[in-house]
Amino acid sequence: MNTSLSWFEQLDVLLNATDGNVVRNKQWLYPLGVSTELIGLCICFFCSSGCIFLGSPPQNSTAVTPAVLWEESEIMQKELKLLQYQLSQHQELLLKQLAEGRQAQVGSWKIPRGAPFLTWSPASFSSMPRVLSKRTYSFGAPKCS
């Protein structure tokens, strides 16, 4: 770009040169669910002269270069990996707690080993028929008087 142009004019030239490509990229990326921030970052990253921020004219000491953007992207990738690791650890903890909760719930459904009816001896069942036999039941048809 011509350095004799003001930064507004440089921006205008840059935007006019890239408008067609940006529109095509957006039309291609929007159906894929790519956010506008990510599209803007990609456009900014591949801009050969660095990003031009609208708030103030670019300063040589603070100009964003592809190398700086690459370093920032590497930092963001490391942060993303850290967040993924933390998320997987949290997910494992939640799954463990869920499994423990299910075990506790299943344990409440189980019959304890010392339950009285599990410890009765067969001899205690032999008295039941005698008790039942002492009672008289009439299973026949009801008698009419």
UniProtKB/Swiss-Prot annotation:
Main location (coarse class): membrane
InterPro entries listed in its UniProt record: CCDC159/163
Transmembrane segments: 38-54
Designated name of the protein: Transmembrane protein CCDC163
Subcellular location: Membrane
Membrane association type: Single-pass membrane protein
Keyword tags: Membrane, Transmembrane, Transmembrane helix
Any Gene Ontology CC annotation: membrane
